[in-house]
């Protein structure tokens, strides 16, 4: 059966231009990524080496000088080490063989789906939720990028206001005729710096929470989605293989292969259904967690920004207390991990 499969693979036609280069199809980029994902699960053979060649063979045979008519051949008996090496080599060969067959079947199924010659299992509701998650993640990544830009601008503004306040304070000491004017401008800049530091703390907390939601929670769910999609491809590949065997002639050899294909198909079906259930559960919990986190963070962001631009220092400080945000004093070092526990 394997020889037949490899024979088909060897005769696959690839469209070629007149200049000898393979023709690029519109979906080549996506297809290449999918093929890389299929090939990435190859076996790791670096732990032990595969032993090849003869086992227990003799070196240079010694023929004794005597009256014997028949020369005696020196042979080295196989030791325990040779048996272990044979076992390791056999296991590695089986791993490579199974991986090669699985990769071929999945690649064949992927190409059949891409070129419209094969069928695929589709859970419309689940795939819609997965696509919605990917779109939501892209939008949240955009919000995260803008939030980081706002943090950088606020920090730069604080540095400028602090320097301007120091300059006004210095000039108030050196210009008696303008001492009062420079003085209250210096106090204004200092107050703006204090409120700005409070706002910066709130925005940093907002950005940190969004970052955790995007890079940890959403990414964890998408990793399970990738496992589900790989299991779906394997399930369809072995389903197609079973259907082709079922349509063939029924003899003693075919019945054995059919039973083996049925068992393999059932194993991949169980794996696919389990991962489909895992994805559905993670999507549900992710949605609940996202709503809970964003409700809190959007309220914090609104209250802090509104209080800052209204010049309401008391409300700004109350906002940070409401969300248990503690500001580090200027120049303070970051606490150690032990202090944060």
Swiss-Prot record:
Chain positions found as Phosphothreonine: 76
Gene behind this protein: ARFIP2
BP terms from Gene Ontology: actin cytoskeleton organization; intracellular protein transport; lamellipodium assembly; mitophagy; protein localization to phagophore assembly site; regulation of Arp2/3 complex-mediated actin nucleation; ruffle organization; small GTPase-mediated signal transduction
Molecular function GO labels: cadherin binding; GTP binding; GTP-dependent protein binding; identical protein binding; membrane curvature sensor activity; phosphatidylinositol-4-phosphate binding; phospholipid binding; protein domain specific binding
AH domain boundaries: 121-321
TM spans (from-to): none
Function: Plays a role in constitutive metalloproteinase (MMP) secretion from the trans Golgi network. May have important functions during vesicle biogenesis at certain cargo subdomains, which could be predominantly utilized by secreted MMPs, such as MMP7 and MMP2. Also involved in autophagy by regulating the starvation-dependent trafficking of ATG9A vesicles which deliver the phosphatidylinositol 4-kinase beta (PI4KB) to the autophagosome initiation site. Involved in phagophore growth during mitophagy by regulating ATG9A trafficking to mitochondria.
Modified residues (Phosphoserine): 72
InterPro entries the UniProt entry points to: AH/BAR_dom_sf, AH_dom, Arfaptin_fam
Subcellular location: Golgi apparatus; Golgi apparatus, trans-Golgi network membrane
Assembly and binders: Forms homodimers or heterodimers with ARFIP1. Interacts with RAC1. Specifically binds to GTP-bound ARF1 and ARF6, but binds to RAC1.GTP and RAC1.GDP with similar affinities. Interacts with ARL1. Interacts (via N-terminus) with IKBKB and IKBKG; these interactions inhibit activation of NF-kappa-B.
Protein name, UniProt field: Arfaptin-2
Keywords, ordered alphabetically: Autophagy, Golgi apparatus, Membrane, Phosphoprotein
SUPFAM superfamilies named in the record: BAR/IMD domain-like
Gene Ontology, cellular component aspect: cell cortex; cytoplasm; cytosol; Golgi apparatus; nucleolus; plasma membrane; ruffle; trans-Golgi network membrane
Region annotated Disordered, chain positions: 46-85
């Amino acid at each position: 059966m394997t020889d037949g499969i490899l024979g088909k693979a060897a005769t696959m036609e690839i469209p070629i231009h007149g200049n000898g280069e393979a023709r690029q199809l519109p979906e080549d980029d996506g297809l290449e990524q999918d093929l890389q994902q299929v090939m990435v699960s190859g076996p790791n053979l670096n732990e032990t080496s595969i032993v090849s060649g003869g086992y227990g063979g003799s070196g240079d045979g010694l023929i004794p000088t005597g009256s014997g008519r028949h020369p005696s051949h020196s042979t080295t008996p196989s030791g325990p080490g040779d048996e272990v090496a044979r076992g390791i080599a056999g296991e590695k060969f089986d791993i490579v063989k199974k991986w090669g067959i699985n990769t071929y079947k999945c690649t064949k199924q992927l190409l059949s789906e891409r070129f419209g010659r094969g069928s695929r299992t589709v859970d419309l509701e689940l795939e819609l939720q997965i696509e919605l998650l990917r779109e939501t993640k892209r939008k949240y990544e955009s919000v995260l990028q803008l939030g980081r830009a706002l943090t950088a601008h606020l920090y730069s503004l604080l540095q400028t206001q602090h320097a301007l306040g120091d300059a006004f304070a210095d000039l108030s000491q050196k210009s008696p005729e303008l001492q009062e004017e420079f003085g209250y401008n210096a106090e204004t800049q200092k107050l703006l710096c204090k409120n700005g530091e409070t706002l910066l703390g709130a925005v940093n907390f907002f950005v940190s929470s969004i970052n955790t939601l995007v890079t940890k929670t959403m990414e964890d769910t998408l990793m399970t989605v990738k496992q589900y999609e790989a299991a779906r491809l394997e399930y369809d590949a072995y389903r197609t293989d079973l259907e082709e065997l079922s349509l063939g002639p029924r003899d003693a050899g075919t019945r054995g292969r059919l039973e083996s294909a049925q068992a393999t198909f059932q194993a991949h079906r169980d794996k696919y259904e389990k991962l489909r259930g895992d994805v559905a559960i993670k999507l549900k919990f992710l949605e609940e967690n996202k709503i809970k986190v964003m409700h809190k963070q959007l309220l914090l962001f609104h209250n802090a920004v509104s209080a800052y631009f209204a010049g309401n220092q008391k409300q700004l400080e109350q906002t940070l207390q409401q969300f248990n945000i503690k500001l580090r004093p200027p120049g303070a070092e970051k606490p150690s991990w032990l202090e944060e526990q």
